[in-house]
Design a protein with these regions (language model features):
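Short, charged surface segments at domain edges that flank catalytic/cofactor-binding sites
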Residues: 3-57, 81-98, 111, 115, ...
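Beta-strand-connecting loop/turn residues
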Residues: 56, 68, 73, 179-181
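Hydrophobic alpha-helical segments that mediate membrane insertion or helix-helix packing
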Residues: 58-61, 245
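Histidine-centered nuclease catalytic patch
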Residues: 63-150, 155-156
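Domain-exit/linker segments immediately C-terminal to small folded modules
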Residues: 117-241
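Conserved small/polar residues in nucleotide/adenosyl-binding loops
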Residues: 245-252
């Protein structure tokens, strides 16, 4: 897992969010119209920025994300139960740039329609600091088609997690083994489980990554494998995995 540096692109992120907020102000009626998360996630420039921050990788499983498959993840969940709100806002404020003074808890329904917002801080549901790019949770579980929402963003829901990507030592905290499994401290078990990062599809993908590194397979070979099925199969042919015919043909193409 990689560290996501939200400070590096802070100015660009704030510029997009400020422009979004300004655009939603209606001077005629002196109020905001459609100032909400669903409108923000339509802005392509914002998605591109999040992908750039993450070098194109999913914040959780580290697969490359095609732009049309990007989902936006609220690190501090969009909606918190009233009885847990105070505790969880305090909890998430310890990570990254989720500190008070930069963002504040405010789901869509609580964003005031007037007067104009003075930012920063930003409502957490539309704050650059609180949003990262995730995949669709696409995995293979047999049959002809992949299943969505089986890991990462949508699988998590509103579960309380440790946002590991906001810890500078993230790559050391969660380590990839050559057999595709993950090793991590026991205190992160619930986070890994909430994200389903030990799903068999993800384990298989990590085996492939390990083989590429261990066998010094060149970038040129990897790029050729994207369009050449024979090369792709040759790269993964000695992995001891059963019943991955469809996975070999499809999933590895986008993630080698």
């Amino acid at each position: 897992m990689q560290f996501i540096n939200k400070f590096k692109y802070k100015r660009k992120g704030h510029r997009i969010i400020k422009a979004f907020i300004k655009d939603k102000w209606n001077n005629d009626i002196q109020r905001y119209v459609n100032l909400n998360y669903n409108e923000l996630k339509r802005i392509k420039a914002f998605k591109y920025l999040l992908l750039k921050e993450q070098q194109g990788f999913c914040c959780y499983c580290m697969r490359k994300i095609p732009f049309n498959e990007v989902t936006l993840e609220h690190v501090m969940p969009h909606h918190l139960e009233d009885k847990k709100r105070k505790e969880e806002v305090k909890y998430y404020s310890k990570f990254g740039r989720l500190k008070r003074g930069k963002i504040y808890y405010c789901p869509d329904k609580e964003i005031p329609i007037s007067p104009k917002l003075h930012t920063p801080p930003y409502p957490h549901c539309i704050a650059h600091e609180n949003l990262v790019a995730s995949c669709q949770g696409k995995v293979f579980e047999g049959g002809e088609k992949y299943i969505l929402h089986k890991c990462c963003n949508n699988f998590r829901g509103n579960d309380k997690i440790v946002p590991l990507f906001f810890i500078p030592r993230a790559a050391e905290i969660v380590r990839y083994e050559i057999d595709g499994t993950l090793t991590y401290f026991e205190k992160y078990e619930s986070t890994i489980s909430s994200l389903n990062l030990m799903h068999s599809t993800l384990i298989f993908m990590r085996k492939i990554w390990a083989k590429i590194v261990i066998n010094n397979i060149s970038l040129n070979q990897v790029n050729k494998a994207l369009t050449d099925n024979d090369i792709r199969i040759n790269i993964i042919d000695d992995i001891d995995t059963v019943s991955y015919t469809h996975l070999r043909a499809h999933e590895t193409r986008g993630n080698l």
